[in-house]
Amino acid sequence: MMMVLRNLSMEPTFALLGFTDYPKLQIPLFLVFLLMYVITVVGNLGMIIIIKINPKFHTPMYFFLSHLSFVDFCYSSIVTPKLLENLVMADKSIFYFSCMMQYFLSCTAVVTESFLLAVMAYDRFVAICNPLLYTVAMSQRLCALLVAGSYLWGMFGPLVLLCYALRLNFSGPNVINHFFCEYTALISVSGSDILIPHLLLFSFATFNEMCTLLIILTSYVFIFVTVLKIRSVSGRHKAFSTWASHLTSITIFHGTILFLYCVPNSKNSRQTVKVASVFYTVVNPMLNPLIYSLRNKDVKDAFWKLIHTQVPFH
């Protein structure tokens, strides 16, 4: 506890090296990431608003989707602004407390999203495999508990890792070779022994991935078998459309997490890690609302209706 208080009182400063060292790429990358961030904010907030104001979407599936959009919006807003700032500003410093909070909030969002994706897979399993029991099985109380559990567990692991990070000694030079305060990059600049934090991170990441992917894969095996039994071509197409959109999001998100955190003794270069990190910090939050809305006629119709309502055409 004394070590934690001492670290907070001394307030060391970190420097984020950013995404690239090449000056000629910084402005083009700034414009690309800015566009992606705008799409992310508009897409996710738009999804939340559409689900909130339209009674047609007051169902468990859209309830979970609204929370997924909220987590994506928060996560992108935690990471991307600092990424954009470092691409155009000479001063790349970040205070100790700000860095720790960025790590904690971003990691919380990642873990929460992984469990929300598992919850959404289970929801689709119940809807497709047991449609007659869907409204009973997926009650409002159960949906609220599943979402609350995702948020609470999303905070638990990152909080434990944060406690260990706060005990580390950062005496400088505190240069983080990343575009945000990612945990492995953050603790690597410490002068303390970081074996335990690394083992904890690997254990938490592996446990979370095993649990969520087991739920997801089991759900989709049953979904796939059930869909093959559907005689109606339109019904089979609709079921596969929902399945495919969810699977696309899962592949991008979990594939990156497995690559970065669940492969021990990885020899990947730091630049490779940065590029991979972009997929789950910038690309995935942007794609999720596009994936779900472009494959959903009801969402597209509601979106254009909202646009025409708010922006009258003469």
UniProtKB/Swiss-Prot annotation:
GO terms for molecular function: G protein-coupled receptor activity; odorant binding; olfactory receptor activity. Signal peptide: none annotated. PROSITE patterns: G_PROTEIN_RECEP_F1_1, G_PROTEIN_RECEP_F1_2. GO terms for cellular component: plasma membrane. Residues 1-27, 78-101, 163-198, 261-273 are extracellular. Keywords: Cell membrane, G-protein coupled receptor, Glycoprotein, Membrane, Olfaction, Receptor, Sensory transduction, Transducer, Transmembrane, Transmembrane helix. The lineage of its organism: Eukaryota, Metazoa, Chordata, Craniata, Vertebrata. Residues 49-56, 123-141, 220-239, 295-314 are cytoplasmic. InterPro entries: GPCR_Rhodpsn (IPR000276), GPCR_Rhodpsn_7TM (IPR017452), Olfact_rcpt (IPR000725). One of its GO terms (biological process) is sensory perception of smell. It comes from Homo sapiens (Human). The keyword Cell membrane applies. Its main location: membrane. Belongs to the G-protein coupled receptor 1 family. The chain crosses the membrane at residues 28-48, 57-77, 102-122, 142-162, 199-219, 240-260, 274-294. Odorant receptor. It is found in: Cell membrane. Pfam families: 7tm_4. This is Olfactory receptor 5D14.
